[in-house]
Amino acid sequence: MDSYIDIKVRVWRQAGPKAQGHFETYDLKHVFQGASFLEMIDILNEQLVAEHKDPITYDHDCREGICGMCSMYVNGHPHGPDSAITTCQLHMRKFKDGETITVEPWRSRAFPVIKDLMVDRGAYDKIMQAGGFVSVNTGGVPDANAIPIPKPVADEAMDAASCIGCGACATACKNGSAMLFVAAKVSQLALLPQGKIEAAARAKAMVAKMDELGFGNCTNTGACAAECPKSVSLANIARLNREFLAAKFKD
């Protein structure tokens, strides 16, 4: 049964992109363990406002593990110490009474801090704009049911499509690589007939944009898949490598 705990929250505070950041520690008492992590931040912000202090700025939207906006490091882990969840799905029952919880923004050169825990993840949007779509005419909605796709292939495409673009893979990687994100977005389309027509151009364009934006190289450490809140498989990176190599041979 959930109870109430007293905690210390050690939060990264940074006034702006060019400002010098620092940690500040706050005491928070009588926190219900059934509360979500973001609800705890909300309670802390109410306390800060009541004390006439600047509330903590952080990104959030759906609070259902879908949008990927609640991007923050919690005790050294992207999205927190629990596995296969986003920060908004993390609950305070994961923490103990008297514990100090350290909260930081994404650690990646490609995701600059805007303020406090909020970062600019626009780099992922630019990669998607480079080729993460189907632009050819694939017919109307009923036509999709006329194209037979084996269930194992459809399942693989669906697993790749579960990527929510949160950025945990790039920030968990010691090289700051976005390969798992790019691989998931390439795979979900390359596996399906509608996406095969532009597969070569897509792989080259998205990898080129990833490199242009300053993401690091993949060295197969597997940290990205270990921290991914949607458990996207490393097999997608292998598929991206095959797609990219095949595309280069077509040049």
Regions found by a protein language model. Name each.
Residues 3-27:
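Eukaryote-biased recognition of intrinsically disordered, low-complexity regulatory segments
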Residues 35-54, 101-251:
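Ferredoxin-type iron-sulfur electron-transfer modules in oxidoreductases and energy-metabolism complexes
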Residues 24-36:
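Short, contiguous acidic and Ser/Thr-rich linear segments
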Residues 74-98, 103:
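Glycine-rich phosphate/adenylate-binding loop and adjacent beta-alpha elements
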Residues 57-69:
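Short, structured protein-protein interaction patches enriched in aromatics and acidic/basic residues
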